[in-house]
């Protein structure tokens, strides 16, 4: 059976200095499912979304503006989002939400930054 397993979120480096770069790495095992989307949140606010390609279209990435969160789109993809010039506002709960398509399964992994 296709299922989504083992979603984890890592913050690299574990202690992010203000003004530095941070990488949020969302790891997951799709088994036989198809990826639909990966969304990243700070608290309840989404700041980055990756949507897998459908019907031959290119994968889509979208950034949602949140003060203090600067996404480096050129280095962000289905498994990581890179933040530059990190502000104090990264502190707290960040999460990644992985959704599969056919069968539809959604799982969330949380981390502290």
Predicted regions and their residues:
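Short, solvent-exposed loop/linker segments at the N-terminal edge
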Residues: 14-20
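Ligand-binding face of N-terminal immunoglobulin V-set domains in extracellular IgSF glycoproteins
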Residues: 25-27, 67-113
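Short secondary-structure capping/turn segments at boundaries of alpha-helices and beta-strands
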Residues: 10-12, 23-29
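N-terminal Sec-dependent signal peptide, specifically the hydrophobic helical h-region
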Residues: 1-14, 67
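N-terminal V-set
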Residues: 31-67
